[in-house]
Amino acid sequence: MSQILEMCAEQLYQSEQKLKPIAPIRSELGEDATVDDAYVIQDINTERALNSGRRLVGRKIGLTSVAVQKQLGVDSPDFGMLFADMAYGDGEAIPPGKLIQPKVEAEIA
């Protein structure tokens, strides 16, 4: 399985580098894939980013709504890494050429 995880990490890395979307990797992971497998893939690419000089500045928490968790068949929030080159200040323009499929999500408190 570790070879498959490495291959999936490489596909995601190349997608980010080339700013080109790829098909979901879940079919390559197989039905036995776990959330832990997904975090291994994330760890591989986090290590790669840190080794290339990117600076980790925080984390992005997702799936915080129980309703959304149920919709997606999970039972807890997930998280991803936020690097300095991904963070923008209030009112700062975000260059669209740096994003693969830009979207906006409202966070209502």
Per-region residue spans from a language model:
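Active-site microenvironments in enzyme catalytic cores
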Residues: 2-109
